[in-house]
A protein has these predicted regions:
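A short, charged helix-loop
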Residues: 67-81
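Non-catalytic interaction surface on structured domains
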Residues: 39, 80-87, 116-117
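Residues that scaffold the ATP/ADP-binding catalytic core of kinase and kinase-like folds
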Residues: 57, 78, 120
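Short acidic/polar capping segments at secondary-structure boundaries
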Residues: 18-19, 49-53, 74, 84, ...
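Structure-specific DNA junction-binding interface
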Residues: 1-64, 126, 130-146, 152-155
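DNA-contacting surface of Y-family translesion DNA polymerases
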Residues: 86, 94-158
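A short secondary-structure junction signal
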Residues: 58, 80, 98-100
């Protein structure tokens, strides 16, 4: 199975092969959360779904110390209720553009065709178009090129 680190405290895990041996993704996530708690005394949130977009939204949905599962059957309907700001890659500027077009939720975004979105959002249009349908084709990548290396020290005085 694959682990794609995103930051010090966040990662995507593809456990689709392990679930055949060890049970559901939810059971595995519960076990991982318990191990983190025992080892560090810290809580962790987990989002389980059939793609990275919905797994991230699920994780953010139930913080702190939550566990949220979105099935493939629930995904497309779930996405309709999301505010566009909850979609990956939608920051304040993109949200403002979408609002100017009358797009406030995933359901609103479903009313737009890809050719209509492309002039406004460029390359990102295809991602938004698919996201509104619960589709995310990005795969978990175990090996990624490191973007930066840093260390941090805290001193008694500045």
């Amino acid at each position: 199975d694959l682990i794609e680190p995103l930051s010090l405290d966040e990662a995507y895990l593809d456990v689709s092969q392990q679930t055949l041996k060890l049970g559901s993704g939810s059971l595995m996530a519960k076990d991982i959360k318990q191990r983190i708690k025992r080892a560090t005394a810290l809580t962790a949130s987990a989002g389980i779904s059939y793609n990275k977009l919905l797994a991230k939204i699920a994780s953010d949905r139930d913080k702190p110390d939550g566990l949220c599962y979105i099935s493939a059957k629930e995904g497309p309907e779930f996405v309709k209720s999301l505010r566009v700001r909850e979609f990956f890659g939608v920051g304040p500027a993109t949200e403002e553009k979408m609002h100017a077009l009358g797009i406030y939720t995933g359901a609103d975004l479903l009313n737009w065709t890809l050719p209509e979105l492309q002039p406004v959002f460029g390359k990102a249009a295809e991602f938004y178009f698919n996201a509104a349908r619960g589709i995310d084709t990005r795969v978990v990548e175990a090996e990624r090129v490191r973007k930066s290396v840093s260390t941090e020290d805290t001193f008694v005085r500045d």
